[in-house]
């Protein structure tokens, strides 16, 4: 694992102050040391192209059809979730997009209606970069498919997703919702 802090220690003579830990670091340095720092940190870096590809870890491949409100409720015994105790993450494939639309006060959330390979309707939500998602859909399935999905019309979009199931509460109604973290 790459540690930004350890790499910065190798250049410490260039800083007026610095600190951090393996996941993050901060520094102050004079303007004239910016370029020498850039050169040294890149020279010392042991990162490979493979290190720059995000690694996606799931707990288990699990069809969305297997997830129930009861199962999601039982996950609460694993809480609290955070960096050292991540929430359970699963994967499923062959999910057909029947509709997608942007919601949220800032138009920054994508809701999707999906159909599982068993024909089960699924409510999903995506909090990531919507434009990148749309670009992926356009590139893989075409602009017509994207526009059809945005209108709730038949299309050829089929996704594999990494997701976390949740219980959504809206106006006192509870429903199962799948938060998409990664897609392909």
Mark where each language-model region is.
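Acidic, two-metal ion nucleic-acid-processing modules in DNA metabolism proteins
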Residues: 1-184
């Amino acid at each position: 694992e790459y540690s930004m802090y350890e790499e910065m220690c190798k250049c410490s003579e260039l800083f007026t102050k610095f600190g951090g830990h393996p996941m993050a670091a901060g520094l102050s340095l004079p303007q004239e040391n910016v370029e020498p720092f850039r050169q040294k940190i890149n020279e010392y870096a042991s990162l490979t192209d493979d290190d720059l590809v995000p690694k996606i870890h799931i707990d288990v491949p699990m069809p969305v059809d297997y997830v129930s409100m009861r199962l999601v409720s039982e996950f609460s015994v694993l809480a609290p979730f955070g960096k050292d105790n991540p929430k359970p993450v699963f994967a499923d494939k062959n999910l057909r997009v029947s509709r997608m639309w942007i919601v949220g006060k800032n138009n920054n959330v994508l809701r999707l209606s999906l159909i599982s390979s068993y024909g089960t309707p699924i409510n999903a939500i995506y909090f990531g970069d919507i434009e990148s998602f749309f670009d992926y859909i356009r590139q893989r399935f075409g602009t017509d498919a994207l526009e059809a999905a945005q209108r709730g019309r038949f299309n050829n979009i089929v996704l594999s997703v990494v997701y976390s199931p949740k219980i959504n509460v809206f106006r006192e109604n509870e429903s199962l919702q799948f938060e998409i973290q990664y897609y392909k």
